[in-house]
Swiss-Prot record:
PPR repeats: from-to residues: 194-228, 230-262, 263-293, 297-331, 332-366, 367-401, 402-436, 437-471, 472-506, 507-541
Cellular compartment(s): Mitochondrion
Superkingdom of this protein's organism: Eukaryota
Alphabetical list of InterPro entries matching this protein: Pentatricopeptide_rpt, TPR-like_helical_dom_sf
Family to which this protein belongs: Belongs to the PPR family. P subfamily.
Gene Ontology CC terms, in alphabetical order: mitochondrion
Designated name of the protein: Pentatricopeptide repeat-containing protein At3g62470, mitochondrial
Organism annotation: Arabidopsis thaliana
Transit peptide: 1-99
Keywords from the UniProt entry: Mitochondrion, Repeat, Transit peptide
Amino acid sequence: MAAAPWLHLSRRRSSTQTSLRSFLICSSSFDSDEFISSQSRVIGGRGEEEVRFSGALFSRMIHSSTYHPYRQIPLPHSSVQLLDASLGCRGFSSGSSNVSDGCDEEVESECDNDEETGVSCVESSTNPEEVERVCKVIDELFALDRNMEAVLDEMKLDLSHDLIVEVLERFRHARKPAFRFFCWAAERQGFAHDSRTYNSMMSILAKTRQFETMVSVLEEMGTKGLLTMETFTIAMKAFAAAKERKKAVGIFELMKKYKFKIGVETINCLLDSLGRAKLGKEAQVLFDKLKERFTPNMMTYTVLLNGWCRVRNLIEAARIWNDMIDQGLKPDIVAHNVMLEGLLRSRKKSDAIKLFHVMKSKGPCPNVRSYTIMIRDFCKQSSMETAIEYFDDMVDSGLQPDAAVYTCLITGFGTQKKLDTVYELLKEMQEKGHPPDGKTYNALIKLMANQKMPEHATRIYNKMIQNEIEPSIHTFNMIMKSYFMARNYEMGRAVWEEMIKKGICPDDNSYTVLIRGLIGEGKSREACRYLEEMLDKGMKTPLIDYNKFAADFHRGGQPEIFEELAQRAKFSGKFAAAEIFARWAQMTRRRFKQRFMED
């Protein structure tokens, strides 16, 4: 296959150039029997050759580590469905279109964090202007005592479930105004919440770890007969993410109480949630307790494998792999990709290459995800020529590259400041029928932001809008931070206004970026207003330069500002934040008194 015009690399396929296949096959130090053992046995009713991980390889890997007996193999989130859509639980997939395409880990993790906890997406028939009117009232009046509810009453709204869901979506990072609106709607004559609106509120409470209120809402749903599997999944995942293992398992008891069946999909969801929270050992203990009560399937073992890899225990991962085989299950491409990615992330590149070779020679054949995993790692290590060899081999194998693969290459070349190559890649994506997606644009914006080119980041944002791709909150956070870093405070605030105009609810990071920018601009009084807004909304206290913040108010003769913030935080139930502000109030008073004595 001829090299693409954007490569700008001398890569002629000749005797002087080693092809990818030769590169893999000629790994002379590789003995596949050391890596795997092949046995002939009947799997699934037919004679096939199975692959087992030998103890020898893992023993060598473990003893080469300074972290004995653990290896560092954190696996990234997959963006694919684990269960049916009704459960909304993410998991693994062999489909290439569902590759976790966050070639930039920060972009990926923040996008993951921004993902909904599990509320079903249903097309809405609500008038956008009506949603905007309601949100404006809430945004302007929620901090006041009862004015918000009074104004909402005067609006004579035609309440619908779609309207409630859309408004809650707009305030998904601001639990207090969201919950006040939810409670107000519940009291309106002629309106009653359904399962969907309850689950929307459950998701917000779960995300902000308001577990006591979340369980109360769940039990209220139970008394009204509105519980769904999605409700339990939201609660289960929330407790697991907070490492509240016992409470996560306790959801099973609530399911029994309300006569819900606990099947393999439900158990898989809990095991997966525990594994993602790096509670692999706890997931294994739970599995061992329950395995006699249900029939584990391939996904069960895959989520356990992932869980052990995330806590860097390859010995247990290998045991799960071999247990899978002993149960008559043949590890599929998903399980292979989990192990492949784990080896790369633990910096065992040579072993990952060997496993990739085994997959090509003995199966299952690598899919687009497999190639993306390899290409992503080479790009992160700036081994762009090798990354392109894998890209060419993928195409030669009959696989079609998707936006995820291109995003990896774009990130790699962009990090090396080869922007001409980046733009050629973007052009090829369009020509090949794989236009940039949201993560591609976010990766580009981050590249521009890191290189202190906020104007270029804005141009990419405009292109994103032109192509009808909705920006995420992370998109705005990156551009806003980029402008503030460049000391272009006016544009930084303009990005904030654009985000609000787009109807995107600012999260903790958004407020932190804005407040830091305002403090840097010397506008601590305005920053204080947004800090108070965060506290009123029930958000976390931001990490900011409190020294600069205090100095500004000290110079302005306003040492009492931290006392006011401490009282506000205490009133909002943010006791840790109240203590922080109280300490700063004490220091500021002391400094002010010292200055007064000197004068």
